[in-house]
Amino acid sequence: MFTIDLSIKNTAFPITVQRKTAEDAEAVYQLILAAIRSGNPDIVELKCEGKTEKKIAVRASEISGVQITQKDGVTTSSGRAPGFFALAGE
């Protein structure tokens, strides 16, 4: 399972969705990068494959960062992979 974390401006916690394959995670990553680069305030809608009931919509102009991590990797005491907020949470 791959986790895609979106860092949102003026928000302390990332928005997270999951994908089952590396290819699907990379496709979401590229979609988010394209939305950030466009500079348009378009809405980006995503669904989570890990929790099928989870859906999010976020304005592309509010996304400040994106990262992909593999879920079965190293985790911190909070159970999350190190990333945007790993130091702040410990």
UniProtKB/Swiss-Prot annotation:
Similarity field: Belongs to the UPF0367 family.
Matches recorded under HAMAP family: UPF0367
Protein name in UniProt: UPF0367 protein asl4547
Taxonomic lineage: Bacteria, Bacillati, Cyanobacteriota, Cyanophyceae, Nostocales
